[in-house]
Amino acid sequence: MGLLDLPAPVFAWTDGVLSGTLPPLARLALWALLISALSMALYALLSPQAELKRLKTEMRAARRALHDHDGDFDGVKTLAARSVGLSLRHLRLVAPAALIACIPVIMLIVWLAKAYGPAMTDSGLPLDMRVTGGDAKLRVVTPGREPDGAGSGALLAVFGADGTFIAQAPLSPRLTRLEKRRWWHWLAGSPAGYLPPDAPIDSVQVHWPRYETHAIGPAWLRGWETPFLALAVVFTLTIQAVFRIE
């Protein structure tokens, strides 16, 4: 589990409770509202709102003075320099709070990509499985069943070209890639685990069908990304306007 995965159990529990009463699209809308409110609240608390209000007044005055200037070029340079300086100061004031406020959003997106990304097939088997960076044999095994039979508790077992066991992982839509641990996994971990460092292959890529949260529009619009991101933007702008957050 990486740092961005820390709130994942809370997200999963909450989504599980909501799933009893709300369809996927409604849950995504609720997630978008909650995360928008949280991120804007963090931004408002961490940013110097009073100073930003004064600064925006100065910025408007500087732009107006530049627009209305009818003198020599030196005067234009002075007014332009002041306008740019105020804009850079504004960026310096909002950047730290904005970056911190983005962290909960990123954490939720990381979880949504795993929870609402791939979908289980009717057979329980993925659409395709590929090995990269070497040669290996893949076998789907369910305890109590014949090899290559899918079902509850199915495992994906990875063997070397010589038949040596390498690794295994639960076969579910959470397993989209089985690879060696990389430096970026301290941020976002692999829910399926990792290949051993000395494995003769680089990764196993497992392809599942895309989970569709609604039936509106073409297939590429039916995933979780479009409704969640669109609603998050709308909710964020609405909250900013209603509460007059600078």
For the regions a protein language model found, what residue spans apply to each?
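Transmembrane alpha-helical segments and their cytosolic interface motifs
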Residues: 81-117, 218-232
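Short, aromatic-rich amphipathic segments at membrane interfaces
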Residues: 9-21, 193-225
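Beta-strand-enriched, solvent-exposed domains that form extended recognition/catalytic surfaces
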Residues: 122-206
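Juxtamembrane interface at the cytosolic side of transmembrane helices
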Residues: 44-57, 229-246
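Alpha-helical transmembrane signal-anchor/signal-peptide segments
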Residues: 48-62, 112-132
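Juxtamembrane "helix exit" motif at the C-terminal ends of alpha-helical transmembrane segments
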Residues: 12-15, 103-124, 239-243
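Hydrophobic alpha-helical transmembrane segments
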Residues: 16-44, 217-230
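Membrane-interface amphipathic helices and adjacent TM-edge segments
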Residues: 45-95
